[in-house]
């Protein structure tokens, strides 16, 4: 059997990681400014993370959600405190797409509606309704194209008001900062108006913080810059630092019903140990504050490069838009300067490093970046 060939791959085999660096099988060191799609939050192979997962797998890796798992309760309590959402409830699953599927399902159970509002260039996952809410027709199969979703321009207040005024929208789902869409930031005016109109029309507001959350923006959640509280928040990626895990943070307005939501692997003992280790390190090493400080520095320095059309972002979630396609630039960064970066579309270079990126590593990236321009 061979692998189903759906990933365009760089010819590099990464075998080791430490902090913000990774090494290939030949021993070549790379600076990781991408964190595997924003997944690596506290750094590769953090000693505390390794210790907690190792101890847990030696004791109990998994048992089902038919018995008490006190680690889940610890994750919920800690996440409530660290995020400022102590009065919300937590449902644990394995991936971002699952988080958004369950969020949308919960919203529809709540108000009985079936219509969803998403936004231009949004990305919410690759399954069922999550992919239908993703504004990319090339990955929406006919079986997923069921007419539930209307896409609106981001930050267009009037278009949003007109659509919600119809009174038939189940949920609005929006990213705290658009990631795949090119590091596009919703304005505070738009987000506050969206919160107001959702409340007035009985529409559930879902904040997809899968890429922009967990401290990446310089606040725990990117929407906290906008001073709003959504009804549901979805998290994944950074929650487990590479261990598959995700969560749905649910407002007290929703009442749980036995059997309404469910999962086999979600919230397993290993995943919870990973999540607890991540929160330990985020707090002990002040990684949210570090993301803001180092991110602000990078944003300021990158704006000095005349070759870049526009620099966007918050914290360590940064997009560099160029006039021309960035494919060759990205290749030179990887093969010549040994720096991993990401892309959004054809013209935006995406930076999503671990939140422990130091000022010295930021300077090293800037020096290498300058050499390839």
Feature annotation, model-predicted:
Residues 1-373:
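Conserved N-terminal phosphate-binding loop of PLP-dependent enzymes in the Aspartate aminotransferase
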